[in-house]
Regions:
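Non-catalytic positions within long, well-ordered alpha-helices that form the structural scaffold/packing
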Residues: 41-44
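Secreted/extracellular ectodomain signature
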Residues: 31-37, 59-60
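Short aromatic-glycine-(Arg/Gly/Cys) micro-motifs in beta-strand/loop hairpins
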Residues: 11, 15-20
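N-terminal basic/disordered segments at the start of proteins
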Residues: 1-12
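Short catalytic-loop micro-motif centered on adjacent basic/acidic residues
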Residues: 49-53
Length: 70
C-alpha cells in the first residue's frame, strides 16, 4: 500500500515534499488546511491508500481533510 504524511506549518506545498521507495511513501508540507485538502485529493488520485496527518491539524482540520477526500 502507498501512504503519505501531511505536515502543517510554514511550507510551500509545491516545493516542500519528499518521497522514498519510488513514491510508495511520501511526505508533503502544507501551509493551511485548504492546501492539505488539495494535496490529499491529489495523493488519492495518484493511488495513495492511506494519508496520515500531523497533530497540528487538530480534530476540525482532520475532519475537513477527511471530508475533502470522501
Amino acid at each position: 500500500m502507498k501512504f503519505a504524511f501531511l505536515i502543517l506549518g510554514a511550507f510551500d506545498e509545491a516545493r516542500d515534499r519528499a518521497q522514498i521507495a519510488g513514491g510508495a511513501a511520501q511526505i508533503v508540507g502544507v501551509p493551511d488546511v485548504e492546501a492539505a485538502c488539495r494535496q490529499a485529493q491529489r495523493l488519492m488520485d495518484e493511488g495513495i491508500g492511506c494519508i496520515e496527518l500531523c497533530g497540528a491539524f487538530g480534530e476540525a482540520g482532520a475532519r475537513r481533510v477527511m471530508q475533502a477526500t470522501g
